[in-house]
Amino acid sequence: MAATCSLLASFLLCFALLSAVSFAADPFVSYDFRVSYLTASPLGVPQQVIAVNGQFPGPLLNATTNYNVVVNVFNHLDEPLLLTWPGIQMRRNSWQDGVLGTNCPIPPRWNFTYQFQVKDQIGSFFYSPSLNFQRASGGFGPIVINNRDIIPIPFPQPDGELIFIIGDWYTQDHKALRRALDSGKELGMPDGVLINGKGPYKYNSSVPDGIDYLTFHVEPGKTYRIRVHNVGISTSLNFRIQNHSLLLVETEGHYTSQANFTDFDVHVGQSYSFLVTMDQDATSDYYIVASARFVNETVWQRVTGVAILHYSNSKGPVSGPLPVPKTDVSSPWSAMSQPKTIRQNTSASGARPNPQGSFHYGQINITNTYILRSLPPTIINGALRATLNGISFVNPSTPVRLADRNKVKGAYKLDFPDRPFNRPLRLDRSMINATYKGFIQVVFQNNDTKIQSFHVDGYSFFVVGMDFGIWSEDKKGSYNNWDAISRSTIEVYPGGWTAVLISLDNVGVWNIRVENLDRWYLGEETYMRITNPEEDGKTEMDPPDNVLYCGALKNLQKEQHHSAATSILNGHLKLMLLMVLLASVFRFC
């Protein structure tokens, strides 16, 4: 009996220790996100916004390199919901990406738990809804991934941090805006710009009385890290703080060569970090401004967000006109001067100890080139649609990898053209069949009339070139093959192109889309399907235990009667029960 007990106890102890090691390898952070409607008046007009945990914008998701993140999302809306995490690479785990090509929507009154690791990442990002134009009503919030203690940041530790979530805003909610697009109308000029969910300070008589604005309190002489995210619908915004320099240090997970700017253009879907030193006198407060860019700024004057920077020893309120952007965009060529100065800090360590410049991307042979051309929206099959390479994407009813795993035929096509052709525009479920371990060049050619931001899920890419005109092979001679910035969202100017290089080392299905919400809603997107023909469980995770089913697989979905548990949380519970059982065995023996 004693020998049996000893053997059983030894087995259970070994199993428990192995389980503990597997769970303790990297820490966990857990969040509950309750997504619901909230009545607010950010521009003085009562309207329905989308809040997370009663907050608009939503709460900060704060993690550190390699942490496991668990986000339990409760959908209290009256329509399906998905949250996506632009820039978070979801290594081997496109099941958590939160777009229709990878996930079934969370039905109303249901919840779903996202579970992912921020593997080898640092930096500034945000989360937002990906369905039904919901981002136009909110549901967004910031993400910060901190360096591990053993990896130094390439600048002195700031005295504090400030987060700015900026974006254009309409006083109509997302459903009304969606109906306008569905009826074939363009949205027109926004009603304003919000800074952290608040309207503009009354800097002149054009701003209505009674609008709630933000004041940021700072200490003189201190240096703050300023994280700026443009979560808006379609408007590029110029960000500036009156009389203060912006020292650019990071964008979307990579440290930049440090450069000072008086003002900075932040395009839709982009995130940046700056260091700002409070080195001005305190005779008065200072304006913080986010204003529409690359438009007729006189006509678009109302599309301006204004907050206040308040020194603790300030002697009075700010007054007078707003500071104007000093960065010249009067000609197309000058408009590109700022983004071309954004380069990688090749000597800094990012998420790993090795310098960011140790990956010599400029010496790798390109295996495939994809030229993705956008056009102005047009009518296809009686509806207003937007296209890439003449195809307006229609999301499959069954997510791609679920269809693959369950042998669903005809869910999508792998025939997306690698360049634009002179063919009739069409609706289709056409996707890129990309090669695992390939090294591809993607050229975004913007033949639309507006500046656009393009994003690739699951990856960062090297921004090697941009120019006006039509891209051709000889343009590669002008590429930056040494210190191009690596990021996940890049602007493309109307009548111009931007070229990026991507190393395809992340198996899964990954969305390529325009971040301008109106164009995205109208179909300007596609997906890359990347599979490993020698898959052995090491390059792609299995579907999570709580996967949702829809489309051709909807009969597999069970009714949800309680909180959707995650495998991690279940694992912790099982480990706890195992330890209790082990204690009982020792006591019995």
Curated annotation (Swiss-Prot):
In terms of SUPFAM superfamilies, this protein maps to:
Cupredoxins
**Region of interest called Disordered, as start-end residue ranges on this chain:** 322-356
- Going by the UniProt annotation, this protein carries glycans at N62, N111, N204, N243, N260, N296, N345, N365, N433, N447
Residues carrying the lipid (GPI-anchor amidated serine) are: S563
Q: What's a Pfam family this protein contains?
A: Cu-oxidase_2
Q: Indicate yes or no for the key word Transport.
A: no
Polar residues bias locations: 328-349
| Presence of the UniProt keyword Cell division in the record | no
Which residues, if any, are the signal sequence? 1-24
Arranged from A to Z, the UniProt key words for this protein are: Cell membrane, Copper, Glycoprotein, GPI-anchor, Lipoprotein, Membrane, Metal-binding, Signal
- Places the protein is found: Cell membrane
* A GO cellular-component term linked to this record: plasmodesma
Propeptide, chain numbering: 564-589
Indicate which residues the UniProt annotation says bind Cu cation.
H455
Cofactor(s) needed by this chain: Cu cation
Membrane disposition: Lipid-anchor; GPI-anchor
Q: Name one GO molecular function term.
A: oxidoreductase activity
Family per similarity comment: Belongs to the multicopper oxidase family.
PANTHER family, per database record: MONOCOPPER OXIDASE-LIKE PROTEIN SKS1, MULTI-COPPER OXIDASE
Which protein, by its recorded name, is this? Monocopper oxidase-like protein SKS1
Report which gene this protein is encoded by: SKS1
